[in-house]
């Protein structure tokens, strides 16, 4: 499954300004963040919970930010 992280990416820029600042607040490298946002590495549950805290959204919104499937155009 391929997930669409565009809403998450938008929230990152809105709250943190840059992906680099978000990665720093998450205690992960920018490379790791990039791999996660490009569906090369999975997000772990504690990382999703921490992201919700850093980006100030409710845990009930995790589905919107992390589990929206990417629609493929053929």
Placement of each model-derived feature along the sequence:
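Short, charged recognition helix plus adjacent turn
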Residues: 1-2, 10, 15, 35, ...
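Residue at a beta-strand N-cap/secondary-structure junction
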Residues: 16, 42-45
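Short basic helix-loop element that most often maps to the first helix and adjoining turn
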Residues: 5-25
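Recognition helix of helix-turn-helix/homeodomain-like DNA-binding domains
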Residues: 28-43
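DNA major-groove recognition helix of helix-turn-helix/homeodomain DNA-binding modules
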Residues: 46-62
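Helix-turn-helix DNA-binding elements, focusing on the entry/boundary residues of the two helices
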Residues: 19, 30, 48
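Alpha-helix N-cap/N′ positions at the starts of helices
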Residues: 3-4, 43
